[in-house]
């Protein structure tokens, strides 16, 4: 017996994923793929707000046949609004990891419990699998 995976409609997913926190970038998301990021740690608070850069993470959630898969990276969010992949400085690592871990708990609960769908790391993931620690 086969069962089809039933996904909530795209608009409902956007609303629910937005409610998880201030992370969903609607303009960079599309049907079946959702882009999240977090500006976790300011590099220089002495600069004017529009010139500030941050250390943080971004995560892409992609629909699969049975749920979703994710991949994420760490880096610097520059003053132009671009992510630049890179190694986090030691003094910023804890703050950045905490925000990612906190978000992943909320994301997992939503996908697995509320939607009754699967959530797995992408085969393309270069970082550690989330929730495995």
UniProtKB/Swiss-Prot annotation:
GO CC annotations, alphabetized: cytoplasm
InterPro entries: Tscrpt_reg_Crl, Tscrpt_reg_Crl_sf
Pfam family, any one: Crl
Principal location class: cytoplasm
GO BP terms in the entry: positive regulation of DNA-templated transcription
Region (Essential for activity): 99-122
Compartments reported by the entry: Cytoplasm
Alphabetically ordered keywords of this record: Activator, Cytoplasm, Transcription, Transcription regulation
Biological role stated in the UniProt entry: Binds to the sigma-S subunit of RNA polymerase, activating expression of sigma-S-regulated genes. Stimulates RNA polymerase holoenzyme formation and may bind to several other sigma factors, such as sigma-70 and sigma-32.
Homology family: Belongs to the Crl family.
Protein name (Swiss-Prot/TrEMBL): Sigma factor-binding protein Crl
Gene: crl
């Amino acid at each position: 017996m086969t069962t089809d995976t039933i996904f909530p409609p795209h608009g409902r997913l956007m609303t629910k994923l937005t409610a998880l926190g201030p992370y969903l970038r609607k303009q960079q998301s599309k049907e079946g793929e959702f882009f999240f990021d977090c500006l976790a740690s300011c590099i220089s608070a002495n600069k004017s707000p529009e010139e500030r850069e941050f250390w943080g993470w971004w995560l892409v959630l992609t629909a699969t046949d049975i749920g979703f898969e994710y991949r994420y990276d760490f880096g610097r969010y520059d003053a132009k609004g671009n992510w630049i992949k890179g190694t986090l400085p030691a003094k910023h690592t804890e703050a950045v990891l905490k925000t990612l871990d906190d978000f992943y708990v909320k994301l997992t609960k939503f996908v697995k419990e509320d939607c009754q769908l699967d959530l797995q790391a992408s085969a393309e993931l270069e970082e550690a699998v989330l929730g495995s620690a």
